[in-house]
From Swiss-Prot:
Composition bias, Low complexity: 1-20
PROSITE patterns named among the record's database cross-references: ZN2_CY6_FUNGAL_1 (PS00463), ZN2_CY6_FUNGAL_2 (PS50048)
Keyword RNA-binding applies: no
Protein name, entry field: C6 finger domain transcription factor hasF
Compositionally biased residues, Pro residues: 197-209
InterPro entries tied to this protein: Sec_Metabolite_Reg, Transcription_factor_dom_fun, Zn2-C6_fun-type_DNA-bd_sf, Zn2Cys6_DnaBD
Organism: Aspergillus fumigatus (strain CBS 144.89 / FGSC A1163 / CEA10)
Physiological role: Transcription factor; part of the gene cluster that mediates the biosynthesis of hexadehydro-astechrome (HAS), a tryptophan-derived iron(III)-complex that acts as a virulence factor in infected mice. Does not regulate the expression of the HAS biosynthetic genes (at least under the growth conditions tested).
The organism's taxonomic lineage, starting at the top: Eukaryota, Fungi, Dikarya, Ascomycota, Pezizomycotina
GO terms classed as biological process: DNA-templated transcription
DNA-binding region residue numbers: 34-61
Disruption phenotype: Does not affect the production of hexadehydro-astechromein the laboratory conditions tested.
């Protein structure tokens, strides 16, 4: 007996007499869904004579009609006829689905890179009565959605408007769902076609972690006027966007105009956009943009001082920050951000976390970034967008997805270091390419992306950001390599395997890191640095940023190497250079508060604390190597910068700074002036001055990962070191170029300390 026959019995009473028959009739339940939808386990909209799912799939749609009790004997025969009819239609449907699946499998086997799963032609005509359910809610138009595969392990469900997307894993859905409607239901998207009388348990609830009352309008949390909105947008362009690069500015300008018109009832027109086209955008897309607009307002206020906020907007900075942050949180909750396919909602969340990321308190950011990573995976940002052939994705969306994913990777690495954890995202977890080295004005909305992934050399709006992303990529590889080696060593010791020699393994890793760093340096030099002019502020910022990345690589490797093996693996020359640059970095950060030109980037600089550099200085001052007389000048300079840090940051009350200040205090106590008298060097160069010859390349690395990895094993053996003469200088600049790092550093500081130091602090 098939499932249809058994289903039909629920609506057919048995021809029995007596009390049991009365009980049977009392429990009788009316079936309103068609038998085909019941058998396929999909939601039926009860449309007559053919429901929408059956119409789209070209299936036979049959309903069970309840009969009066007096006609019970004849109803059994009717039910049997219905069952036999549906048995035949079910077999036809099975054959049809099998044919579809066979075609999909053939496409996937023969090369699914160009596979695009579209709905059947049947039932896709627009404007038909079946496109609207009985409650008056419009069902999704299949022509606005495509399901495209990249030829690897899944597909991307793309909507025509708003850049909405969902990642569809091939493991469960991509080859087994024959309609986009089915895919959306399998993914849990029940927003379309849901009946109006759904039970209370199915109604949307405020999502965790931003639980609270849901709101329909975010106007109470918006700025007072459209003029304030435009002023905050300009502040965002000036102070925040150069450090984040999350948006495409022409697209953002157009969307902001729509937002202002929608919120304040104005008729402002975007430059270069026809008014009719601008007004035709549905309001629901503006709702998805509102959290991003409020996040931009938050970031703009966050980048200003309290005095500037009061002067420009006649309000307290803390009050406006609380207002806009609450608006962002309510907007995220309203848009169901945990499951949303909207990339604008995810941009809002990432921008908010970027502004709130502080090296001295990464606990909240670290936790919420776990949500961000899962949201990005759900939207398929971890897959290279240009590999998905779809008419619903233009070049702007391709670049936006790349930028957003790699900003998430950057925050993941930074927060992981701040929490002493291994980065969550690994290189093998994604295929998304780095953003192209191209200006926003050269990306045209609606232009179809090509297979061309070439990123032209030169200096653009993206160059500084790309230099940082290349550095983060190299940092992550070094950290993961050291973690893998650490696990191997610990496992070998635990298993009693004496065939693994830690020093030899670390020396081999040293050679690997050297090769990795050299490749990165050559790429940066070829693609970007040779086109930079140190006389131009933003290009000088890129040069400063690039110069410190190599130092960061060796600093990370040093701190991730167990203490007992460091001196046997890393050469004294590299150790001295890294220590000198660490001191320069902390000196630079201490001077930043006095630089008025750096105020607009102070929100970004203040989120860095140089914990890694401070810990590096403290650890090296305790070694015999830097207690020798030939290092007296560098040692005195290091002690001076630690004392200046105590004076500058002594008022900090965060738990992390309490620990760091205590460590610095203990270090200064051990190295009191009575034990180590000051040298004439300090009289010549104050503690906060740049030191000629040592360079002033600085960056602000995140907090150190646990540097004292406990590794059991024998003492350091005198094994031959790699040929350290082959290790290139940590000064990245090619001496044949016009810009020489050592000789020009002080001149750059005098010309523009803002762009010089902000560049290196951008890491």
């Amino acid at each position: 007996m098939d499932s249809t026959t058994s289903s039909s019995r629920f609506s057919v009473s048995s021809p029995q007499s007596g009390p049991s028959a009365g009980i049977q009739k009392g429990r009788q339940r009316t079936i309103t869904a068609c038998l085909t939808c019941r058998r396929r386990k999909v939601k039926c909209d009860h449309a007559q004579p053919v429901c929408t799912p059956c119409q789209r799939g070209g299936r036979v749609c049959t309903y069970v009609t309840p009969q009066p009790v007096s006609q019970a004997p004849s109803r059994v025969g009717t039910g049997s006829r219905v069952s036999r009819t549906n048995l035949r239609s079910g077999q036809e449907e099975i054959r049809s689905r099998l044919e579809r699946l066979e075609k999909l499998l053939e496409r996937a086997i023969s090369g699914g890179g160009n596979m695009s799963i579209l709905p059947d032609a049947k039932g896709t005509s627009t404007g038909s009565p079946s496109d609207v359910d009985q409650g008056g809610n419009a069902l999704p138009n299949p022509k606005c959605e495509t399901l495209s595969a990249d030829g690897y392990d899944g597909a991307l469900l793309l909507e025509a408007e708003g850049g909405q997307s969902r990642w569809v894993s091939s493991l469960h859905y991509a080859l087994l769902a024959d309609e986009i409607h089915d895919v959306k239901m399998l993914l849990g998207d029940q927003s379309s076609g849901a009946p109006a009388d759904s039970p209370p348990s199915d109604q949307p609830t405020p999502p965790f972690p931003f639980s609270g009352s849901t709101v329909e309008s975010l106007t109470p949390w918006s700025p007072k006027s459209a003029e304030d909105c435009l002023a905050l947008l300009e502040i965002f362009y000036s102070n925040v966007d150069p450090m984040t690069r999350l948006v495409h500015k022409p697209t953002l300008q157009r969307r902001f105009t729509q937002y202002i018109n929608h919120t304040y009832g104005t008729r402002t027109q975007s430059p270069g956009v026809e008014e009719a086209a601008d007004a035709s955008r549905p309001d629901h897309t503006i709702h998805a943009f509102e959290p991003l607009a409020l996040a931009i307002f938050y970031s703009a206020i966050n980048s200003l001082s309290a005095e500037d906020v009061m002067m420009r907007f006649a309000a307290e900075k803390d009050a406006l920050l609380a207002q806009f942050q609450r608006g962002v949180e309510l907007g995220l909750g309203r848009e169901d951000f945990l499951t949303t396919p909207s990339i604008e909602v995810l941009q809002a969340f990432v921008l908010l976390l970027t502004c709130q990321s502080r090296e001295d308190d990464m606990s909240r950011t670290w936790t919420l970034l776990g949500l961000v990573v899962r949201m990005a995976l759900s939207q398929g940002l971890h897959r290279e967008p240009s590999l998905f052939p779809s008419s619903n994705m233009d070049v702007v969306q391709v670049e936006t997805r790349r930028r957003l994913w790699h900003q998430i990777c950057h925050l993941d690495f930074r927060s992981a270091e701040g929490r002493g954890q291994e980065p969550t995202i690994a290189d093998e977890d994604y295929t998304t390419l780095l953003p192209r080295n191209i200006n926003d004005e050269d990306l045209i909305e609606g232009a179809h992306p090509t297979a061309e992934t070439y990123s032209p050399p030169g200096f653009t709006d993206m160059t500084g950001h790309l230099i940082r992303l290349h550095g983060i990529h190299c940092f992550r590889r070094i950290v993961r390599s050291t973690y893998r080696l650490e696990r191997r060593i610990k496992s070998s010791v635990a298993n009693g395997n004496g065939n693994l020699y830690p020093i030899a393994e670390l020396q081999s890793l040293f050679v690997e890191v050297r090769t990795m760093v050299d490749e990165m340096v050559n790429h940066l030099q070829t693609q970007y640095l040779q086109y930079c002019d140190p006389q131009i502020p933003h290009q000088r910022m890129a040069l400063g940023l690039a110069a410190v990345i190599e130092w960061r690589c060796w600093s990370i490797f040093w701190l991730r190497t167990p203490k007992q093996y460091r001196e046997a693996v890393v050469s004294p020359e590299i150790r001295q250079t890294v220590l000198a640059k660490s001191v320069s970095l902390v000196e630079s950060l201490n001077m930043m508060s006095d630089d008025k030109d750096a105020q607009k980037f102070q929100w970004h600089i203040g989120g860095h604390a140089c914990f890694q550099s401070i810990m590096h200085i403290v650890s090296e001052l305790e070694t015999p190597e830097f207690q020798a007389a030939n290092h007296r000048s560098l040692r005195s300079r290091a002690l001076s910068v630690l004392k200046r840090t105590m004076d500058t940051r002594g008022h900090e009350v965060t738990p992390m700074w309490n620990v760091i200040n205590r460590i610095i205090s203990n270090c200064l106590a051990k190295n009191a002036p009575s034990t180590f008298p000051l040298s004439p060097f300090q009289a010549m160069f104050p503690p906060n001055a740049a030191i000629p010859g040592l360079g002033s390349s600085t960056t602000v690395p995140p907090q150190t990962i646990a540097q004292n990895s406990s590794v059991s094993g024998g003492s350091a053996m005198a094994t031959p070191l790699p040929d350290l003469s082959e290790v290139g200088s940590l000064d990245m600049q090619d001496p044949t170029l016009a810009f020489d790092w050592v000789s020009e550093s002080n001149a750059l500081m005098r010309r523009s300390p803002l762009m010089f130091w902000v560049g290196v602090l951008e890491l």
